[in-house]
Regions:
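N-terminal accessory segment detector
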Residues: 1-131, 137-156, 175-187, 193-197
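ATP phosphate-binding glycine-rich loop and adjacent ATP-lid/helix-beta elements
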Residues: 156-162
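Low-complexity, intrinsically disordered Gly/Pro/Thr-rich segments
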Residues: 163, 167-179
Length: 197
C-alpha cells in the first residue's frame, strides 16, 4: 500500500485528489431511503400477522422479511440513493481488494437506519476480521413482544439480512450472537470472515 508520505515529507504524486475540488459532497444517508423502506415494510403489521404462529414459523417469516429488506436496501443504496460514502467505499474496495467490513457494514447500517430510524444501535468493532453490532433498543423485538410473541424469532431477521448483504459483497461470513434481549439489555452480533474468505 502506498501513502502520500515518506520520511515525513509529502509526496504529491501519491495523494488522492477530489474529482471536483470545492464541490459539496453528500456523505449522509438520504431521508428518501428511510421513507421508501418504512413505507414498504410496516413492523407493527408484520408482528400482528405473526401473532398466531409458533416461534419456528415466526422465525422463518422474519428470515424472509430480513432478506427482502436487505435486497431493497442494497438496491436503493447502490442506485437511487448512492451517496459519497458508498462511492468511496467501492472505490477503496476496487483499489485495495478489501471488502470486509466496510461494504457489508454500510448495508447493515443503512438497513437498520432505513427500517428502524429510532432504534439505538452501535458498531463497536469494525476490523478486517470482525464486525460487532450492538442493538439496545429494537423496534422489531418491541413490536413482537407487544403482540405476545415470546422468544427471539427476530434473530432470523437479523441473521438473514446480514447473510444477504454478505452475498452481495462476496464475503463469506460467520455470525454469532453472544448477547440477547432482554437478558443482556441488548442483542450483540459478531460477524466474522471465514478463513480464506
Amino acid at each position: 500500500m502506498t501513502t502520500g508520505w515518506k520520511y515525513g515529507k509529502l509526496l504529491k504524486e501519491r495523494l488522492m485528489t477530489l474529482e471536483k475540488p470545492g464541490k459539496a459532497l453528500l456523505f449522509d444517508a438520504d431521508k428518501g431511503l428511510v421513507e421508501e423502506i418504512t413505507h414498504k415494510f410496516d413492523i407493527g403489521a408484520v408482528a400482528k400477522s405473526l401473532q398466531d404462529k409458533d416461534e419456528k414459523e415466526a422465525y422463518k417469516a422474519l428470515e424472509e422479511l430480513g432478506r427482502n429488506l436487505m435486497k431493497l436496501t442494497i438496491e436503493l443504496a447502490d442506485n437511487k440513493y448512492l451517496d459519497r460514502t458508498g462511492q468511496m467505499i467501492e472505490k477503496v474496495y476496487k483499489q485495495t481488494g478489501i471488502s470486509f467490513p466496510h461494504r457489508l457494514g454500510r448495508y447493515v447500517e443503512l438497513s437498520v437506519f432505513g427500517l428502524r430510524p429510532t432504534d439505538r444501535w452501535n458498531m463497536t468493532r469494525a476490523t478486517t476480521r470482525e464486525l460487532v453490532l450492538q442493538v439496545s433498543a429494537c423496534s422489531i423485538y418491541k413490536a413482537l413482544n407487544e403482540v405476545g410473541i415470546k422468544g427471539l424469532p427476530c434473530k432470523g431477521f437479523c441473521f438473514a439480512s446480514f447473510e444477504t448483504a454478505a452475498d452481495k459483497t462476496g464475503d463469506r461470513i460467520n455470525i454469532g450472537m453472544p448477547k440477547t434481549l432482554p437478558e443482556n439489555s441488548m442483542c450483540e452480533f459478531h460477524v466474522s470472515v471465514q478463513p480464506g474468505g
